Amino acid sequence: CTGALIVLERMNNLDEIIRTGTPLSADVIPEMLGTIFYEGTPLHDGAVVIRDGRIVAAGCVLPLSNNLEMGKDMGTRHRAGLGMSENSDAIVVVVSEETGIISLAKNGVLIRRLDRQNLFNLLQEEIIPPETAEAQKQPLLNRLLNKGGAGKHAKTNAAR
């Protein structure tokens, strides 16, 4: 099993973390992540940082969590993921090297034992802000309401 530690930068700038690793400018594709996290490669023990949909660094060192409630079954990778989420608004995906179990750290909380679909859903919720998702729905709603002139009447009646 190959472990992974993937940091998704959000509002907090992570330049300080990025400087601890090797700078990259790469697409986020399975082949690239697989190469980075392949056991034995120089970058596989650190974290990948993703900014604006691009891998900007690999082999980065993250702050470790001091959370005493973490189970003994969680190693350095999980402590680093949790620590990063305690110190920033970043979202961190952790894949256990030993078990392959997927976890997600955000706001100092580690959500464990995610399958791919649950991870996808959580990331989609976190990465696409509600106002953006709502804005994406607006053109469809406008088309539906304006079909056959119903939208004009609905707007006029709503304004009264």
Residue ranges and their predicted role:
Residues 1-160:
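Divalent-cation
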